């Protein structure tokens, strides 16, 4: 099956909803994702797919060092510019600092490499991909263990953030932001930054069955634009992020019902909900490889396709009586990023996100770690289940 269909008509980029960042910059609400979900077939087609997305009207590209394809995306951008589809100033290109480069001295070289790979002189947005240096190699299985992983340590993060602000001042990056923050870690960051150096954007998991409504409202109140990845429930996510407890957004009865009522597909219903959130002030990232799907994903950011009643069926109305379809169905548990104490003390799937192990300083974490090891040894000696396990 051919992915690219040049007979599919493009969308006028001026029709796509724009979100205003804190400094006044306009950012297209809909971003074309470039993560290929460790899928080699999609990886091979990525250059043509991104060029086609630009032809069809996408102007916001969501990239990352961790996706290992920024050179490919860069070739697509270059091809689109050389063929007259777009000029650089019309694009909003976003990339992310990978966890492996979370030492202060590595931040600027990492950005320079991203710019080289993308063939650009500047980024419109640069994010800290995750709030700590824990990482897994691309394609890792779900049970991989990083023995050097640590929890969120605020003083360490702020050293990285200082380098991010230097990049902004240099002009190599127009705006800076974060990804995968919790509300608590975001509160700490905002506490310790001035107006110029605040993040203007936070990318986070958002889809109909995982809406994070309180956090979204908090970010907007702080003039930080929230934007969602896994906007369709990521049906092709890597195996390490698949668990029996997960639910499929597009198969939910309400999503199916609204699709039937409107004549839209389930993906279009999900993205229309994303588009209409908070008066069109929440961004979304979606990846597709066929021309028809690329266009339909983008088109959702051009119109109010859901009636108020249909929107409320998905979103709820803010009352306890009508919570919508949000089931707190988080897809990224992040177990590949767990630090020793998260595993040591009986972690659960929310350990990465529930803020029970975040620390202001390295000294605070060191004290906690010593106590945790001692506690675990006593626990292992005395608790019935653990005595059996280790006997």
Regions found by a protein language model. Give the residues of each.
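Active-site mouth loops of central-metabolism enzymes
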Residues: 30-44, 96-105, 148-153
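Acidic (Asp/Glu)-rich catalytic clusters
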Residues: 20-22, 74-88, 115-120, 190-194, ...
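A short, structured active-site edge motif that brings together acidic residues
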Residues: 87-101, 125-131, 203-206
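Alpha-helical scaffolding within the catalytic cores
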Residues: 11-19, 77-78, 111, 183-189, ...
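Beta/alpha (TIM)-barrel catalytic core signal, keyed to glycine-rich beta->alpha loops juxtaposed to Asp/Glu
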Residues: 130-391
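Short acidic capping loops at alpha-helix termini that bridge into adjacent secondary structure
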Residues: 29, 87-91, 121-125, 174-175, ...
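CE4/NodB-like, metal-dependent polysaccharide N-deacetylase domain
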Residues: 107-128, 166-167
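N-terminal binding-site loop/beta-alpha segment at the start of enzyme catalytic domains
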Residues: 1-91, 108, 163, 169, ...
């Amino acid at each position: 099956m051919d992915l690219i269909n040049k007979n599919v008509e493009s969308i006028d980029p001026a029709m796509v909803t724009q979100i205003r960042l804190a400094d006044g910059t306009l950012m297209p609400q809909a971003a074309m994702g470039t993560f290929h979900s460790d899928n080699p077939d999609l990886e091979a087609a990525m250059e043509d797919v991104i060029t086609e997305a630009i032809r069809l009207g996408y102007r916001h590209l969501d990239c990352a060092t961790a996706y290992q394809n920024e050179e490919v995306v860069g070739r697509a951008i270059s091809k689109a510019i050389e063929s007259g589809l777009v000029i650089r100033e019309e694009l909003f290109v976003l990339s992310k600092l990978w966890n492996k480069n979370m030492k202060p001295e590595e931040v600027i070289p990492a950005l320079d490499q991203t710019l080289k790979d993308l063939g650009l002189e500047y980024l419109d947005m640069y994010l800290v991909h995750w709030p700590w240096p824990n990482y897994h190699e691309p394609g890792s299985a779900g049970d991989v263990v990083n023995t050097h992983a640590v929890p969120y340590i605020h003083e360490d993060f702020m050293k990285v953030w200082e380098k991010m602000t230097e990049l902004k001042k240099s002009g190599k990056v127009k705006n800076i932001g974060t990804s995968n923050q919790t509300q608590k870690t975001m509160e700490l960051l905002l506490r310790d930054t001035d107006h110029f150096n605040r993040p203007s954007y936070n990318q986070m998991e958002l889809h109909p069955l995982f809406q994070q409504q309180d956090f979204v409202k908090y970010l907007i109140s702080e003039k930080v634009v929230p934007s969602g990845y896994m906007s369709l429930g990521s049906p092709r996510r890597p195996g390490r992020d698949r668990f029996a407890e997960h639910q499929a957004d597009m198969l939910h009865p309400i999503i199916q019902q609204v699709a039937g009522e409107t004549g839209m597909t389930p993906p279009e219903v999900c993205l229309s909900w994303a588009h209409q959130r908070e008066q069109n002030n929440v961004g979304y990232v979606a990846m597709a490889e066929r021309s028809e799907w690329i266009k339909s994903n983008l088109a959702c950011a051009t119109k109010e396709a859901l009636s108020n009643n249909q929107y409320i069926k998905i979103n709820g109305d803010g009352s306890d009586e009508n919570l919508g379809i949000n089931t707190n169905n988080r897809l990224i548990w992040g177990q590949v990023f767990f630090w020793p104490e998260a595993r040591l003390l009986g972690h659960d799937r929310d350990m990465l996100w529930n803020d029970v192990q975040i620390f202001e300083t390295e000294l605070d974490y060191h004290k906690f770690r010593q106590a945790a090891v001692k506690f675990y040894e006593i626990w292992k000696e005395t608790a019935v289940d653990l005595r059996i396990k280790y006997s």
